[in-house]
Amino acid sequence: MEAKKENLVEFQKRTGLQVNPDAILFFWPSRLDPFQKGVDLLEHIAQHFVTVNGDAQIAIVADGVGSDRTHADILGRIAYASNGKITYQPFSESLSMLGYAAANDVFGASLYEPCGQIDQIGNLFGATATNRDTGGYHDKIRELRLKRDGSPQDVGNGFLFRDYDPGGLWYALTRSIAFHRRSLKIREMQIKRIMKEARERYDLGSMIAEYVRIYERLNGGRPLA
């Protein structure tokens, strides 16, 4: 967790966020596509979410679709008015990787998603994953439930929402921030488990087999070869 704090501070310095190693960082790495990725839902709630949740920060490192700057401009204005609680940056591979390494939660709001990868990368970097319960995210994000809260065992790697509206995204992020406010001991135990399970699940052979399975399903169940 100390390494994540170091990455967080470096990310904050590079992006103009308030420097606070104890902030809870929500990282959006998906392209700014209102037809698939749900960026309009993010725009509706971002400012209010960081106002209500004083320990939260939101970072977006992404480009629009093609030459469309509509949502980049909207998010830029939201970030400018946030007093260092929200940052928008155009996509850069190095900055995006640092964002994953700094994040507590990697999130999105997809209307549909055949596969999706941001949850996998986030888990590998020690972040929970939050997204809409659809497609690949339905298959890969499992609700985080803890034995100490009554679950038979510690399971899950993130948080899902069903309704494609701002309230749905708000609901899932609120559940995520509640987890990230828990004691260091609890968080550290679960993040280590999530990272271990992600490494086991997303080794190269397993990932190839999973993608073949998904594309065969999209192909009407017919084998690809």
Question: Where are the predicted features?
Answer:
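A conserved mid-protein helix/loop that constitutes part of the nucleotide-sugar donor-binding site
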Residues: 34-47
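Catalytic binding pocket for nucleotide-activated donors in carbohydrate/polymer assembly enzymes
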Residues: 98-189, 198
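A charged, aromatic-enriched C-terminal amphipathic alpha-helix characteristic of glycosyltransferases
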Residues: 182-213
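Conserved donor-binding/catalytic core segment of Leloir-type glycosyltransferases
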Residues: 18-36
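Glycine-rich phosphate/pyrophosphate-binding loop
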Residues: 1-22, 170-185, 196
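Nucleotide-activated donor-binding/catalytic signature segment of Leloir-type glycosyltransferases, i.e.
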Residues: 53-98, 155
